A protein has these predicted regions:
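Positively charged, polyanion-binding regions of nucleic-acid-associated proteins
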Residues: 4-27, 31-32, 49
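Short helix-coil junctions and helix-kink-helix linkers
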Residues: 31-42
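Short amphipathic alpha-helical interaction segments
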Residues: 40-51
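A generic structural-conservation signal
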Residues: 44, 61-62
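Long, low-complexity, charge-rich intrinsically disordered regions
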Residues: 51, 56, 62-105
């Protein structure tokens, strides 16, 4: 797996979060949806997510019982390679300020 592909995937994931949820009000997000919309290979996506998690840019919720899922469903989760599977992604970066018209008077 090329480092450049992982770095590009990390940027794409953060850009997707910025576009989909700029005010950080709609998370958590489903990893498989993000991966499909970005057209990323699973291995590259999973590694990029793990690096963003380690850098504390995102939060990922671990699935409580991933091995009870059918293999096809488990394959949709983010795998850390050590037996932990993540079922959601939330942005930990600061939100953009709300527009003035969105704030009640």
């Amino acid at each position: 797996m090329k480092r450049t592909a992982i770095e590009a995937a990390k940027k794409a994931i953060l850009a997707w979060l910025d576009d989909a949820d700029p005010f950080r009000t709609h998370g958590p997000h489903v990893p498989a949806k993000i991966r499909r919309e970005l057209g990323l290979e699973k291995a590259v996506f999973d590694q990029a997510v793990m690096e963003l998690l380690q850098a504390r840019k995102i939060y990922c919720a671990p699935h409580d019982h991933p091995h009870r899922l059918p293999e096809a469903e488990r394959a949709e989760l983010v795998a850390d390679g050590r037996g932990v599977f993540y079922c959601s992604i939330s942005d930990r970066r600061p939100a953009r300020p709300l527009p003035a018209e969105a704030i009640p008077a």
